[in-house]
Amino acid sequence: MECRPGCGACCTAPSISSPIPGMPDGKPANTPCIQLDEQQRCKIFTSPLRPKVCAGLQASAEMCGNSRQQAMTWLIDLEMLTAP
């Protein structure tokens, strides 16, 4: 499955504890990554600077649903279930 154009849910909903260029302490949940562009695409998608946790997250029908809102809901729910 390929990412839905204009979505960016996986770069917004989850917290990321790994450093990201421009976000050395990672990012909190429900906060857009600084590396998202105006089209909700990752500016460092093909860069070696992209965190491994980001590269390891793959689009799936379960996670992405049928809309950005469904993806945000699924990812925020997962974030709450896995928070320390």
Curated annotation (Swiss-Prot):
For this protein, the record's Pfam families field holds: CxxCxxCC
Protein name, UniProt field: UPF0153 protein YeiW
* Organism expressing this protein natively: Escherichia coli (strain K12)
What pairs make up the disulfide bonds?
none
Protein family = Belongs to the UPF0153 family.
